[in-house]
UniProtKB/Swiss-Prot annotation:
CDD domains: PseudoU_synth_RluA_like (cd02869), S4 (cd00165). It holds the Pfam family S4. The gene is rluC. This is Ribosomal large subunit pseudouridine synthase C. Belongs to the pseudouridine synthase RluA family. InterPro entries: PsdUridine_synth_cat_dom_sf (IPR020103), PsdUridine_synth_RluA-like_CS (IPR006224), PsdUridine_synth_RluC/D (IPR006225), PsdUridine_synth_RsuA/RluA (IPR006145), RluA_PseudoU_synthase (IPR050188), S4_RNA-bd (IPR002942), S4_RNA-bd_sf (IPR036986). Keywords: Isomerase, RNA-binding, rRNA processing. Responsible for synthesis of pseudouridine from uracil at positions 955, 2504 and 2580 in 23S ribosomal RNA. SUPFAM superfamilies: Alpha-L RNA-binding motif (SSF55174), Pseudouridine synthase (SSF55120). PROSITE patterns: PSI_RLU (PS01129), S4 (PS50889).
């Protein structure tokens, strides 16, 4: 058996920390401690705010002083190690950071990396970043992208930045552009796809359905190949698998899409070295939460995808 030990902490709550529930705050502070332990120390009154017991739903206020008790947890040797013990596997994410300042961090997420742990995954990009930056007081996802999609992922470093950026996403003022390699020749006249999407809650498959949620994606052709088209896709709404389903609906599924793709097209693109979902969040434009100035960030394609496109041009 191995042990994880933490020391007692006294934390002064500032404006950036204020507004969040104490249970969520503790789960962020005690990164490698099981959720059940967090709720146990709350229930037993070991966590104090201004020297008083609080319930899990208590919302922190600026000026609060939180006492986080020392915690010891036993971990079986055959259990997955916490992210902090897997730095050799996640350190490569440090090289994927394309922008960083005091308020936010932007990652060019590799394909195959989940944005967060869960569904059988013990850690994702956010857990890895927290392990790489143990001194960071606050790191939270602003939005999400699919595990197999690569590209831009925004992470807030302050709660005020998180609120500001998420408000922009809600108000649909954030502009996102994806690169997708789709089967066949995309019709240049097809610039907007408006098709409602409905998610099956049992198998998570999304389909175009008149009873679904309104969904809109804008498309632009970037380059045509013999049997494929590289398109730029800009989702106006943010539905699950939206670009993937809209391209399939139009008869042009994305290369190597294991849910909505075409195996014959996958075999065709494999000869050029493509063996992953060719969907990449390439560009984002938004208002910086502190400077209030418009910020545009570009995340380059992985080298092997660029090489694949070069081979397709020469074919």
């Amino acid at each position: 058996m191995n042990e994880i030990r933490t020391q007692v902490q006294f934390i002064d709550i500032d404006e950036d920390m204020a507004g969040q529930r104490i249970d969520n705050f503790l789960r962020n502070q005690l990164k490698n401690i099981p959720k059940s332990v967090v709720y146990r120390i709350l229930r037993k009154g070991e966590v104090r705010v201004n020297k008083k017991r609080v319930k899990a739903e208590y919302k922190l206020e600026a000026g609060d002083v939180v006492r986080v008790p020392p915690v010891t947890v036993e971990v079986k040797e055959n259990e997955p190690a916490p992210p902090s013990t897997k730095l050799s596997k996640v350190a490569e994410l440090e090289h994927c950071i394309v922008y960083e300042d005091d308020h936010l961090l932007i990652l060019n997420k590799p394909s195959g990396t989940a944005v967060h742990g869960g569904s059988g995954l013990h850690f994702g990009a956010i857990e890895a970043l927290r392990a790489l930056r143990p001194q960071a007081r606050f790191l939270e996802l602003v939005h999400r992208i699919d595990r197999d999609t690569s590209g831009i992922l925004l992470v807030a470093k302050k709660r005020s930045a998180l609120r500001h950026l998420q408000a922009q996403f809600r108000e649909k003022t954030v502009q996102k552009y994806y690169y997708a390699l789709v089967m066949g020749h995309w019709d240049a006249e097809c610039k907007v796809v408006n098709a409602p999407l409905l998610k099956n809650e049992v198998n998570s498959i999304v389909r175009v359905n008149p009873n679904g949620k309104p969904s809109e994606t804008r498309f632009r052709i970037l380059e045509k190949f013999a049997e494929a088209t590289l398109v730029q896709a800009s989702p106006v709404t943010g539905r699950t698998h939206q670009i993937r389903v809209h391209t399939q609906y139009m008869g042009h599924p994305i290369a190597w899409d294991d849910r909505y793709g075409d195996r014959r097209f996958d075999a065709y693109t494999a000869q050029f070295g493509i063996e992953r979902l060719f969907l990449h969040a390439a560009n984002i434009q938004f208002v910086h939460p502190a400077s209030e100035k418009k910020l545009e960030i570009h995340a380059p394609l992985e080298a092997h995808l660029e090489q694949a496109l070069t081979k397709m041009r020469q074919a």
